[in-house]
């Protein structure tokens, strides 16, 4: 529909039926000298529920005086706010509050059991903001007026009560792509369903939901990662998102743009699923941008929004009468949904006239029949108490701590086994690098040159383990952060259960990789023979692999994206590398950097491996073949040259173990802080 196609001809307070020809008449000047009948909405729109019976499992959801503000981002606004706060503290100047945008303007509405309510409007009308505020899911920086009331069956509710009874399907589908649809639902059942249910009962519920949402054919298909791993189609992913929420059989379902990115066929199948849920007595609310005529017929009620205000609430049939009465009859060659959205849209280049028209429509609706009935009902229904203690959630989380840990551990272990880049490629990479280093330093002898080469090969052990494991951890962990943020905000599991489950599931891989590397490179290079020497070296290399893994966790938890983590990692690792004793003698470290050397795992591991290699090398074992070169007479001389002592080997093990614990605790704290900032 073009710009002229949006014109609604209302002149002299009389409604004029708008035909397709008049809408395309370029000579008309729309909205000029127009007025709106102040009583046009008296008899249009409905508030009556389809069923009078209401229980805790059959909910009427209503919101009253929903007033929402959002921060306006301005260039340099953070710096300006800081300057204003400093002036307020030290200069006794009044702090100027940041500008705010009025997102929702005293909106009220109601959705009943057994009906599908579609929230419609143009982009920026406030549809998603309405849903987020209704479901207590508003993002950081959004402020909701204290006068706002959200009710279930006439009882005011808080975020905890709403979470217990409402399922919220967001626009973006976030999954672990290496799982199948069935595995994903089993995990969701483990953390969502009540703790008194057995595992068998949860699996039976998963089977029932798979059948109800027609996921049987794809239940054993990988979910996949768009653009990387082929998996479920867009419609199947959306139905899987519904299935995740439907496991607990919630009486209220809120969906944000469920048809976004889908073709007309897939969109129709998704909305049909929601329609079936509403026919089972569920209260279903969804936002939709541009529904087809077939989709529009599935809606029981529509709520039209414009400029953050409610412009209409009622059935699609009543909407036809509503807009006809104000002189905006829908032409026969347009779908009603498109026409209503266009009528309530702000036309580029004609913002003043458009906003004036929208304001008049919304103002008149606010004093009409539906708004008056809602006002009266809210005054009658609001009660001081909620659902009562007997109906409140007994636990903050549905699953126990152990069940959360078990579920996360199971899912993380499946991800490790199924992720090709995490297992196959890493094992192949480790084997190739170990063979390459072994062949380059093949069969080193105890000579002057051999001593230098062995020391270099040992340091390569450390650098390879560090960069291979830290960067692998950064890549893997950050990709799950969006899923983690959403699931923790939905109170599916705690931060500590996720962190423990994730790290323990990946631990076997970080034990196999150093063993494989050491088993190949150690004998090829010809390092100190003996079972005790081999296992001492293996223990040190394994500790290095896990220190670097822990450091990778810390970087990934502290950074907001994979690209940022990959950019931050190398510059932070380099200082630790310099204090390893290979480039800079440990006795030459400046006093002001001494503290940093104690945080370097390169220092502890390099010292430990060199002690393991040279501590028991007696005088005469090193062959001196070059007379013009200083030749170390024994292993003790080599260690003294590097400022290492054989007695420090136990402290090297302790230092590496403490770094593992310290980095992981720091990573957990960073992860917890990130999760709390999102709440």
Swiss-Prot record:
Gene Ontology cellular component annotations, sorted alphabetically? cytoplasmic vesicle membrane; plasma membrane
Provide the transmembrane region boundaries. Answer: 427-445, 457-477, 507-525, 534-555, 568-586, 651-670
A molecular function annotated in GO for this UniProt entry is: ABC-type transporter activity
User: Where in this chain does the record put each ABC transporter domain?
Assistant: 84-332
Cellular localization per UniProt: Membrane
> At which positions is ATP bound?
121-128
The Polar residues compositionally biased stretches are: 15-34
UniProt cross-references to InterPro entries, sorted A to Z = AAA+_ATPase (IPR003593), ABC2_TM (IPR013525), ABC_transporter-like_ATP-bd (IPR003439), ABC_transporter-like_CS (IPR017871), ABCG_dom (IPR043926), ABCG_transporters (IPR050352), P-loop_NTPase (IPR027417), Pigment_permease/Abcg (IPR005284)
Q: How does it sit in the membrane?
A: Multi-pass membrane protein
Q: Which residues are glycosylated?
A: 628, 643
Keyword Membrane: yes or no?
yes
Pfam families linked: ABC2_membrane, ABC2_membrane_7, ABC_tran
| Keyword Nucleotide-binding applies | yes
**Where are the annotated segments for Disordered?**
1-34
Query: Known Gene3D superfamilies for this protein?
Result: P-loop containing nucleotide triphosphate hydrolases
Keywords of the record: ATP-binding, Glycoprotein, Membrane, Nucleotide-binding, Pigment, Transmembrane, Transmembrane helix, Transport
Q: Which family does it belong to?
A: Belongs to the ABC transporter superfamily. ABCG family. Eye pigment precursor importer (TC 3.A.1.204) subfamily.
Its biological purpose is as follows:
May be part of a membrane-spanning permease system necessary for the transport of pigment precursors into pigment cells responsible for eye color.
* Entry protein name: Protein white
User: Which lineage do the record's taxonomy fields give for this organism?
Assistant: Eukaryota, Metazoa, Ecdysozoa, Arthropoda, Hexapoda
């Amino acid at each position: 529909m073009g710009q002229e196609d949006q014109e609604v001809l209302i002149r002299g307070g009389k409604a004029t039926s708008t035909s397709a020809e008049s809408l395309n008449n370029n000579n008309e000047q729309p909205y000029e000298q127009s007025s709106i009948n102040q009583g046009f909405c008296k008899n249009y729109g409905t508030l009556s529920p389809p069923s009078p019976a209401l229980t805790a499992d059959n909910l009427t959801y209503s919101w009253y005086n929903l007033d929402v503000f959002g921060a306006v981002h301005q260039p340099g606004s953070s710096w300006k706010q800081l300057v204003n706060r400093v002036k307020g503290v030290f200069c006794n100047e009044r702090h100027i509050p940041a500008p705010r945008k009025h997102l929702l303007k005293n909106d009220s509405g109601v959705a009943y059991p057994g009906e599908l309510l579609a929230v419609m409007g143009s982009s920026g009308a406030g549809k998603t903001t309405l849903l987020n505020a209704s479901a207590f899911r508003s993002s950081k920086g959004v402020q909701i007026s204290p006068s706002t009331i959200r009710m279930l069956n006439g009882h005011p509710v808080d975020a905890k009560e709403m979470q217990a009874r409402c399922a919220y399907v967001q626009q973006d589908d976030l999954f672990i792509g290496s799982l199948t649809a069935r595995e994903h639902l089993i995990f969701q059942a483990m953390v969502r369903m009540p703790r008194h249910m057995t595992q068998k009962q949860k699996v039976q519920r998963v089977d029932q939901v798979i059948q109800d949402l027609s996921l049987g054919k794809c239940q054993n298909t990988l979910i996949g990662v768009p653009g990387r791993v082929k998996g479920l189609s867009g419609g199947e992913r959306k139905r899987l998102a519904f299935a995740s929420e439907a496991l607990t059989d919630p009486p209220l379902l809120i969906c944000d743009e469920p048809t976004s990115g889908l073709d007309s066929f897939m969109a129709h199948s998704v909305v049909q699923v929601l329609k079936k849920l509403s026919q089972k007595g569920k209260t279903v609310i969804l936002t939709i941008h541009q529904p087809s005529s077939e989709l529009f017929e599935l809606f029981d009620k529509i709520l039209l929004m414009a400029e953050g205000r409610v412009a209409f609430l009622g059935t699609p049939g009543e909407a036809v009468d509503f807009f006809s009465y104000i002189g905006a009859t829908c032409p026969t060659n347009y779908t009603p949904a498109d026409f209503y959205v266009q009528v309530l849209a702000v036309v580029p280049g004609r913002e003043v006239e458009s906003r004036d028209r929208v304001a008049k429509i919304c103002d008149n609706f606010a004093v009409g029949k539906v708004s008056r009935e809602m006002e009266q009902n809210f005054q009658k229904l609001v009660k001081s108490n909620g659902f009562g203690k007997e109906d409140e959630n007994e636990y903050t989380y549905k699953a126990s701590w152990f069940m959360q840990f078990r579920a996360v551990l199971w899912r993380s272990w499946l991800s490790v086994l199924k992720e090709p880049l995490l297992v196959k490629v890493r094992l192949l990479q480790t084997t190739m690098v170990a063979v390459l280093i072994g062949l380059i330093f093949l069969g080193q002898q105890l000579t002057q040159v051999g001593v230098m080469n062995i020391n270099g090969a040992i340091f390569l052990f450390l650098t390879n383990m560090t960069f291979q494991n830290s960067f692998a951890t950064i890549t893997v962990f950050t990709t799950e952060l969006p899923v983690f943020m959403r699931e923790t905000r939905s109170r599916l599991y705690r931060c500590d259960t996720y962190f423990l489950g994730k790290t323990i599931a990946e631990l076997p891989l970080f034990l196999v990789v150093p063993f494989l590397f050491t088993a190949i490179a150690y004998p090829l290079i010809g390092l100190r023979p003996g079972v005790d020497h081999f296992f001492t070296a293996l223990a040190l290399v394994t500790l290095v692999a896990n220190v670097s893994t822990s450091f990778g966790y810390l970087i990934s938890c502290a950074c907001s994206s994979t690209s940022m983590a990959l950019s931050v990692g190398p510059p932070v690792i380099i200082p630790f590398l310099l204090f390893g004793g290979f480039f800079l003698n440990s006795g030459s470290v400046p006093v002001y950097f001494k503290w940093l050397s104690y945080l370097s795992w390169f220092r502890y591991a390099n010292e430990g491996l060199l002690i393991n290699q040279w501590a028991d090398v007696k005088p005469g074992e090193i062959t001196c073949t070059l007379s013009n070169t200083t030749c170390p007479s024994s292993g003790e001389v080599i260690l003294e040259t590097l400022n290492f002592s054989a007695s420090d080997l136990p402290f090297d093990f302790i230092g590496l173990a403490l770094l593992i614990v310290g980095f992981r605790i720091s990573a957990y704290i960073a992860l917890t802080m990130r999760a709390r900032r999102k709440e």
